[in-house]
Amino acid sequence: MEVVLIFVYSLLVPVVLASAAKEKEIDPFHYNYQTLRIGGLVFDVVLFLVPSCHLLSHRCKCSFNQKPQDPGDKEAQVENFITANAKEPQKAKN
């Protein structure tokens, strides 16, 4: 019985050594932290500058500078324009 156990354990020794050798292999994936850091900083700068330039260029059509208009204001302007034109005397064409 002891001889059988020694034989079985002797068969397991190469398996254990092979698994230990696999653990010592260098991981082929290597993090390049410097490039990752620079890329992140560039991304942050772009995300900061694009909206800032957009707001500073005054092309943003923000509504805080405009007065609120009533829906009837446009119609009132058209009616005033029509009545103003009707009051002017028409010139005779000769």
UniProtKB/Swiss-Prot annotation:
Residues 66-94 are annotated as: Disordered. Residues 59-94 are cytoplasmic. One of its GO terms (biological process) is positive regulation of sodium ion export across plasma membrane. GO terms for molecular function: sodium channel regulator activity. It is a single-pass type I membrane protein. It is found in: Membrane. InterPro entries: FXYD_motif (IPR047297), Ion-transport_regulator_FXYD (IPR000272). The keyword Lipid metabolism does not apply. One of its GO terms (cellular component) is membrane. The keyword Ribosomal protein does not apply. Residues 19-34 are extracellular. Residues 1-18 form the signal peptide. Keywords: Ion channel, Ion transport, Membrane, Signal, Transmembrane, Transmembrane helix, Transport. Pfam families: ATP1G1_PLM_MAT8 (PF02038). It comes from Homo sapiens. This is Putative FXYD domain-containing ion transport regulator 8. It comes from the Eukaryota. The chain crosses the membrane at residues 35-58. Belongs to the FXYD family.
